[in-house]
Amino acid sequence: MRTIFANFALLLLLSAGCKKGTEKIRLNVPETDPNAPAATWREHWFEHVQVVKNVAYTKEVALYYDDDMPRDITWPLRKAEEIWKYTKVAYAPFKGTDKRLYVVLHYGKYGGGHPYTYFDDGHDNRTGIDIGSNNSWRDSSNWNLDVLTHEIGHIVEGGFKGVKESPAFLIWGDSKWMEIYNYDVYKKLGWDKEAERVMKDMETASDNFPRPGTRWFKDWFYPIYSQYGETAVLNSFFTLLAEHFPTKAHAYGLEYTRRMNMGEFIHFWSGAAKHDLAELATTAFGPNDRNGAAWGPQLVKAKTDFPNIKY
């Protein structure tokens, strides 16, 4: 998968069930609604070449389907709106002029998904997600819901706070931040069964970076989340990045100038938690980064380079 700030390979393997929406989908009638989004949108990115149709919209979300998507599948509008509204408050500010989330869904093509933001000329400076699946979209839980949420989380990572890019992407990869983001969204929206499903799946989940057997959710993100403020600590990490990590001017705001190293990552998360997380990092990750370099000296230097990160 590709995005405005990295190549994403969706790694979501979650499962359960949920009721389907039954409301009648509202057609886009732009001639009678001056605030309606465009009735069609011609894709011109990667291998995407479809003319997708706006099948429904609200103030918060514009939903586009390709010609193979059944029009009676309506839950994505409802779920995306709830997630997007929550996310814009929880991780504020979102500085895009157009506050709508543009959700493009495909059936039978373009497996997986990618996000895009208003920083991206290649997606006409809209903010949204584009997802394809070879399986039915009728289930409003499991992979269908998780990938929708996952891609919105990448917008937080690479396009909130008025800054483009994701300094931590090479450290946590595609899905590690998404796991705690998805869990938080489900919990805070009162989707208890979905949150429980994520928690259950994360009990046995592990990765091979920065070392084999690393349990990102269980040993790193969830301890931070549960002990140091839940949503507030997640948001604080991105706020501190926007305030202190190097940026340069961009046509639509600012852009981070580089990725961060593991020592900086631990330093900024410690600042977000207002607690020294070096011991937790050693337990979760071991003493080295994913390239085999000791992160201890990196952390020492990070404290010198970013002295205003306090904990």
Positions of predicted regions on the chain:
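Zn2+-dependent metallopeptidase catalytic core
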Residues: 29-122, 145
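Zinc-dependent metallopeptidase catalytic helix centered on the HExxH motif
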Residues: 122-200
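C-terminal motif of bacterial Sec signal peptides marking the signal peptidase cleavage site
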Residues: 15-17
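Short helix/loop segments within enzyme catalytic domains
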Residues: 184-208, 212, 225-243
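Bacterial signal peptide processing site
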Residues: 19-21
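Positively charged n-region of N-terminal signal peptides that target proteins for export
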Residues: 1-6
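Beta/coil-rich, acidic/histidine-enriched accessory regions frequently appended to metallopeptidases
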Residues: 252-311
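Second-shell loop/turn segments in exported
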Residues: 63-76, 133-143, 163-169, 206-210, ...
